[in-house]
Amino acid sequence: MIPPATIYLIPTFLDEDALTVLPEYITQAVKTCDVFFVENERSARRFLKKLWKEMEIDRYDWFVIHKSEESTKTEFLHQVKQGKQIGILSEAGCPGIADPGQLLVAAAHQAGAIVKPLVGPSSILLALMASGMNGQQFQFNGYLPV
């Protein structure tokens, strides 16, 4: 019997100078991954190479997450059914928070995978902390248009 897949929600930095604030166990989780689902492949590869300098980037399978592509979800579930160790990375901050990775996390739960969120920066949480607003009663309605 194939053991259940583990999905690591790998945070990325919001500022390139902030690499040192990420805990070491994030690097350890990256080292266990077989495949990565990312919002942007180029920036994810760069980030992971900075995090783990010895990483052989081309040894891994990479899939780009698109909000509405059923093919990405289908490939993700295929990897989950094989019991793979999967890393999900967003462009900046924590995957699954106002991020297309949320769709894969929901699919992972439905498929019985183990989902492990890793501690990291979140622009939403940082904005709430700096606002002085009541953290018990706030609502996030999306990012401002760029």
Mark where each language-model region is.
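Glycine/small-residue-rich loop that forms an oxyanion/phosphate-binding "nest" at active or ligand-binding sites
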Residues: 73-115
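Generic beta-sheet signal
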Residues: 6-10, 82-90, 138
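Class I SAM-dependent methyltransferase SAM-binding "motif I" and its flanking Rossmann-like core
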Residues: 8, 103-146
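Short, structured surface patches at the beginning of a domain
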Residues: 49, 66-78
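Conserved helicase motor
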Residues: 63-70, 143-145
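General beta-strand structural signal in soluble alpha/beta enzymes
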Residues: 38-39, 90, 115-120
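Alpha-helix capping/helix-boundary segments
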Residues: 42-44, 93-94, 123
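Glycine-rich, flexible N-terminal cofactor/catalytic loop recognition
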Residues: 1-65
